[in-house]
Amino acid sequence: MDASEFMDTMDPSLSELGDEFTLGDIDEMLQFVSNQVDFPDIFEDQMGGGATARTLPQAVPSAILTPPHTPVQTSSQTHTQTLTQAHTQTHTQTHTQTRTPPVLQPRPQPITQVQTQTFPMQTLAVQTQAQPQTVMITPTATPSRFIQNQVICQQNNATSFQVLQPQMQSIMTSPQVQPMTIQHQRVLTPAGQTIQTLSTAPTTVHTMSQQVPVLVHQPQILKTDSLLLTTKPDGTQVLSTVQSPTGITTLTTPIQTTALQMPTLMSSNILTTVPVVMGGGDKLPIKQLSSGPAHNIGGARVGVEQSPVVGPGGVVKEGERRTTHNIIEKRYRSSINDKILELRDLVLGNDAKMHKSGVLRKAIDYIKYLQQVNHKLRQENLTLKMANQKNKSACVSDVDLELKAEVSLISPPPSDSGSSSPAQLSPYCIDSEPGSPLLEHEQLKSEPDSPSCVGVMDRSRLLLCALSFLCLSLNPLPSLLGAEAPAGSPEVAGHGPTRTLFSLPAQTQSFGAWLWCVLPFLLVWVVSGVGVVWGCVRVLYLWEPVTPLHSPTSVRFWRHRKQADLQLYRGDYAGAVLSLQTCLSVLSRVLPVTTLDIMCSLSWNLIRYCLRRPAPLGWLVRLVGGRHEGEESQTSSRDAALVYHKLSQLQLTGQMERRPLWGVCVSLSAVNLCESAEGKLTATQQVQVYVTAAISVRAALGKHLTCLPAYLLSCAEALTCQSDSKPLPDCLRWIFTPLGRQFFLSCDWSVRSESDGQIFTSARDKADPIAQLHRCFCQKLLERATHTLIEPQSREDAGEFTGVLEFLQLLNSCTEDSAPSTAPFPALANQSSTSVRDPVCRWWASVLTAAVHWLQGDDASVRSLLAEAERMPRALHTLDHPLPKAVLALCKAVQMSVCPQKGEGVVSCLSHCQRASAQLHISVCQSHNNTWLHKGVELLVCDLLLTLRTSLWQRGGGSNGEPGPAPGSQLSGFQRDLSSLRRLGQAHRQAQHKLFLHETTVRLMAGASPTRTHQLLRHRTHNYTTTDGECVLGERERAHAILLACRHLPLPLLTPPGHRARLLAEAKRTLERVGDRRSLQDCQHILLRLSGGTTIAAS
């Protein structure tokens, strides 16, 4: 900015003063300032004057340089010894003589009239304050100057004011600039005091270098601000300052202006400015300057205001009015812009960019949205209040107090920060807000909890029921009614003329009269019984906790419930137990801890269940508690039932160490709450609750009192028949089948997760007893199928393999498409969200089915089934157990054996047999405490492997068609499998019969003595000769032994001649009965060959 532009922005009120300024005026002012050192007593420090005000020797007014013949009025404070002179006005005129200065000396000062006035001023508060002032004046062509001033003010108790002596001023200047000192002091006093301004100080000049006289040719002007005391229309007074900044201008040097700011106190802090203007040159016209910004300190609107300046003629200039108007408009626009920016930050955020109209439009839309939400919530709040008043009229006052305590309305800040109106509630403020995209956190409706939401222990309920039954047994009503009989009657006072029967008077001897006398007692007993039942029913709802919807209690419950779901999903069962217990505590429900609590809870749950189940009592329960069973009550019962149900599941599966009776109490609580929830639970969830309760009762009682779990199971089955929704999943449907019910009630099972079960079934939810029970059922079906395949039970069966296929078919139906059984909670990571299949169990079922068809001789079915069995599930590959690997190698060997290839097929089949034999040997050596299923599968695999080796040996015959001695590799493999069979025979009785058969076979394969082999076969066959009506263990092995003897032993050993035919006929009947078609075909071939040889010999 150049000098011309700066001059245009100067205050027009100073233009009339600048035309008369000369260099001599400025020099004389400098001399006046420099000569103030002659009065050192004025600036002595007066720090010790605390109680009394010291009087100055003389009053020194503020000197202001003005043009000639132009008087200027300044305000100063005159200190006197008394405070009564505070409102007097003293006019002093000082006359000085004019002199002509030399060329290098300041010219004489013209006569200057200084008028000092003292006027009262009203302030709010006065504080003692010492504030240093520092001014830095930096011309463009010269180094910087530092001007420092310090004013010390003190007020005593006598409401007088004292101006202390400022410190010595020190100025550091450069060699090219004349040192100077500028000092200004201003003091504001309370009402009734005066204002005094002193400007004097000795000056000390420190010269850096060049001790050469310097000609000061730039004038320096010092002008103070004036204080104006204006009166507002309402009668209050506002202190304002007229800021008159001046500028410095020279012909060749830019202007440098600096304002000295001195804080004073008026009700808080008032910031006024003291402009200092320095310049050089001859007469410099002072133009209009822009006023400084307003300062708002301490909440009071006290600022620097631009007031119109009166010219010599007393007329306000037009430019000054326009400047004042522009300043006011600029202030208004700045305030509006600030509020619009604040509104944008509230509605759109700090990063949003939008023009003013868009911000206002968004704010209007948001206000309308809040009004709609407020109206909706008020309507809902009114509805809930009316319902609460209708249901709980006795607690209306308490609820209203809680509502008043909880509802808090917050009004937005006023748009005008300077408004002094008290804060009022906004009509658009709401006490609750739903979630909206403009809010970061969803605020839920805050409602008071109902008085019935406080739960009690079950022992308190049981105590009330016991008291009711005690009243029924004692029945005090008849005694109370009997005490009201008249005491002065002759029948009571003395003996009557005749005898009485049953203490009845003579006129009541008839049956009708007797019944009329007994009827009141019967009515009393009936009324007492009904009252006791009604009291027990009332106990159901007296302290039954109910959680209001969308209340803080409901929010806390769902927060912990979701946390429990997440912990169950991650497998953190200990944390899930704590979260579920917290859920119950939020719902004001208490779990039993001690033995007394468990017994009381069990008794109360049984009483509660008995009150609902019978038809008359159930009708009474619905009649009494109908008005209590609202939507909130049913929802609370549903939430609590699911939590109790999950805790019972965790206790049953071993994830929570509690006693079995504790689990029974929790499961019965879930059943009762499920009955209270009614339609809030789906049919699948209700069936799960009842089945879990039956499992808990069955696990606690064992095989005793099986009628109780059977009753709960029948209730669950009745729910499945009543539901019209989609059918139950297979994981629940199997338990209602006859075989599933028999397994549940009579078999031994455990719902705790076991690692050994993962070999035969897929992994299930460790925290779901129904899933674990389903796993046990699948393992039981596999066990029954395996043992049925190993040993037949009776001849009444249609065939040995028929029962096996039935078990396997039921197993496939149970594992075909099973939905997840944990509907209220998310499935585990190893479960699918749509359906849960058991690929491991189905693989074992396909292997057993292929074994049955291979024994039956159905090679086509064997090839199709083994093609599927060769794709072993990934879970078994990951498990890396030797038994599934042995079974897989056996399946590949059987697959190669049924192929029509001869040479290469036999070699490949034997190699697979070697691998299967090695894995089986490892599995047998590792098994110590395995289940019957594990041992049965090992025995079956070993038997099938030995049977396959025997078949391969018989297939590779010699030149005459009969098989010769087996090679050493085949014989060593057969011996290793036989040793594994001997080891399994120690714990399994059926292995002894198979062991004798395969020991005979190995003698034939090795070419041992046929006489000793015949003796062994004859001893075994004679020991197992049975009657026609029985089928004992080892019958199939005896038939195979007969076939070996008739096929491989010499004919002379089988004497007499008819004995061989009888043995073959018996073996044929046995093989037909067990369904072994492959061995039956061999038996028929031998019979045909035997009959052909007999015919030729006879001819």
UniProtKB/Swiss-Prot annotation:
Disulfide bonds: none annotated. Residues 1-47 are annotated as: Transcriptional activation (acidic). Residues 71-100 have a biased composition (Low complexity). Residues 65-107 are annotated as: Disordered. The chain crosses the membrane at residues 462-482, 514-534. InterPro entries: bHLH_dom, HLH_DNA-bd_sf. Residues 483-513 are lumenal. It holds the Pfam family HLH. Keywords: Activator, Cholesterol metabolism, Cytoplasmic vesicle, DNA-binding, Endoplasmic reticulum, Golgi apparatus, Lipid metabolism, Membrane, Nucleus, Steroid metabolism, Sterol metabolism, Transcription, Transcription regulation, Transmembrane, Transmembrane helix. GO terms for biological process: cholesterol metabolic process; liver development; positive regulation of cholesterol storage; positive regulation of transcription by RNA polymerase II; regulation of Notch signaling pathway. GO terms for cellular component: endoplasmic reticulum membrane; ER to Golgi transport vesicle membrane; Golgi membrane; nucleus. Residues 370-391 are annotated as: Leucine-zipper. Gene3D superfamilies: Helix-loop-helix DNA-binding domain (4.10.280.10). Signal peptide: none annotated. The record marks 464-465, 502-503 as: Cleavage. The keyword DNA-binding applies. Residues 320-370 form the bHLH domain. Belongs to the SREBP family. This is Sterol regulatory element-binding protein 2. The gene is srebf2.
